[in-house]
């Protein structure tokens, strides 16, 4: 558990004969996607370890970074993923963030409706809808507004101590 940094289940690990991690898949998925992930893990060029070596070697083209971010996502390597996302986003023209292939990357940059990039989503709403679909975009915007309310719903902000009579 400690050696492979397993924090919860399900974790699927592909190891070499010496027990070294080659690829990691965290969470469940439908069978076709799971098969794709396992096939990737068995490919030395596309597995987590292979792609990490390429990244450390300086590989930084857009397609590679997008693919690597996807691998890091499936491996639940959030800290490293976030640093790769920052490199990736810095290479893009802001309008490229609107594209469907960048939706999950763009949304990972947002914590809630107060996030720095949230106004970009609202200002480019029609373009995001055209690329990603109205339901997906609308649902995501709703979630961003709801996240602002979470601290009050769970009393992280001292809501119960707030005295309405003082207002």
Regions found by a protein language model. Give the residues of each.
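Compositionally biased alpha-helical segments
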Residues: 1-2
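Non-catalytic, surface beta->alpha helical segment in thiol-disulfide oxidoreductase systems
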Residues: 6-47
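Oxidative protein folding and maturation machinery
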Residues: 55-167
């Amino acid at each position: 558990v400690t050696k492979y940094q397993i924090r919860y289940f399900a974790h699927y690990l592909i190891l070499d004969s010496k027990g070294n991690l080659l690829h990691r898949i965290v969470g469940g998925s439908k069978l076709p996607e799971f098969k794709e992930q396992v096939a990737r893990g068995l490919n030395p060029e596309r597995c987590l370890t292979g792609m990490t070596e390429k990244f450390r070697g300086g590989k930084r083209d857009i397609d590679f970074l997008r693919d690597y971010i996807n691998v890091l996502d499936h491996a639940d390597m959030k800290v490293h993923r976030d640093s790769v996302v920052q490199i990736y986003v810095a290479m893009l023209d802001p309008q490229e963030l609107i594209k469907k292939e960048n939706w999950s990357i763009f949304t990972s940059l947002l914590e809630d409706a107060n996030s720095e990039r949230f106004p970009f989503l609202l200002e480019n709403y029609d373009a995001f809808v055209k690329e990603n679909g109205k339901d997906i975009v609308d649902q995501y915007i709703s979630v961003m507004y709801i996240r602002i309310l979470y601290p009050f719903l769970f009393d992280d902000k001292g809501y119960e101590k707030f005295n309405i009579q003082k207002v």
